[in-house]
């Protein structure tokens, strides 16, 4: 019986924490990210999008790190 009550209380606490964060707040993107281009010094992938903004190129700094640089 205690286990069931504890499970219900924990579920209610988790639900209240999830409901406390507005959905729009977690989904907001900057105009550049929404438009598909990345600003200076952001991670990029030279083979597939999103692409760097105009004047920038995706430069491979190491095997695991590529960034939009001028």
Curated annotation (Swiss-Prot):
Entries under SUPFAM superfamilies matching the protein: omega toxin-like
Keyword vocabulary terms for this entry: Amidation, Disulfide bond, Knottin, Neurotoxin, Secreted, Signal, Toxin
Record-listed Leucine amide modification sites: 69
Disulfide feature: 37-53, 44-58, 52-68
Tissue: Expressed by the venom gland.
Residue stretch(es) of the prosequence: 21-34
Gene Ontology CC terms, in alphabetical order: extracellular region
Subcellular location: Secreted
Main location as per UniProt: secreted
Signal peptide: 1-20
MF term (GO), any: toxin activity
Domain of life: Eukaryota
Domain notes: The presence of a 'disulfide through disulfide knot' structurally defines this protein as a knottin.
Family: Belongs to the neurotoxin 01 (U2-agtx) family.
Functional note: Insect active toxin causing rapid but reversible paralysis in crickets. No activity shown in mammals. Does not show effect on mammalian voltage-gated calcium channels.
Entry protein name: U2-agatoxin-Ao1b
Organism whose genome encodes this protein: Agelena orientalis
Lineage, broadest ranks: Eukaryota, Metazoa, Ecdysozoa, Arthropoda, Chelicerata
